[in-house]
Amino acid sequence: MVMKIYNTLTRKREDLLPSEEGRVKIYSCGPTVYNYAHIGNWRSFIFSDILRRYLKYKGYNVYHVMNLTDVDDKTIRDSQKEGMSLNDFCEKYTKIFFEDMDILNIQRVEEYPKATDHIKEMVDITKSLIEKGLAYKSEDGSTYFSVSKFKEYGKLSKIKLDNQQSTERIKNDEYEKDSANDFALWKSYEESDGEVFWETELGKGRPGWHIECSAMSMKYLGDSFDIHTGGIDLTFPHHENEIAQSEGCSGVAPFVKYW
């Protein structure tokens, strides 16, 4: 009997039909390591663990990747408050995260990539999006994804941008841009970033939040894979932006079969 899985993309229960017979590739949005993970975070991580265990029980070969966000507005802000380097600060909370995982008996997945180890991949995707006319550089040196150029934007969250008011998650991710809906792929350096920056072909700065997951998922799982999990609060804008970036860069759809 074919396993059924609920797909947020279609709002339906569907037959689980992996791209490779007998093998399921999963990506889970992991923690931002700036504080202790809270109960809502753990609900998402426990769900992905149960899913992984059940798929293995059913005989599937599971390859599961969960990222660690170790550079963003929150990690920079709080590392400065504690007077620690970004690396030392994030290592502290990464260690605590894994200790808590063990307490909750959550199995380790195959890969735990860190955002800061994948800057090259983020730059390469951003350059590709610029070349394809899907991204642009603003006057302040930041690079943005042009949402209006991606015609299928909103297919996951079902949000109509004409009626969408700016949210905190959108506002906090942007500097100067052409449209309120556009989001940062690369943020130009500001003094408030302190020592956190990379000198790249995109200029001196750091990655936007959304590009991190596209870069890491595509590196380890390819341009299209089976299942993506994460908190419901990430459906918009984070997961919606992941789809736009990834499909815009690779030209392959769907980026993910089951959300």
Each language-model region and where it sits:
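Hydrophobic residues at beta-strand termini and immediately following loops
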Residues: 65, 113, 186
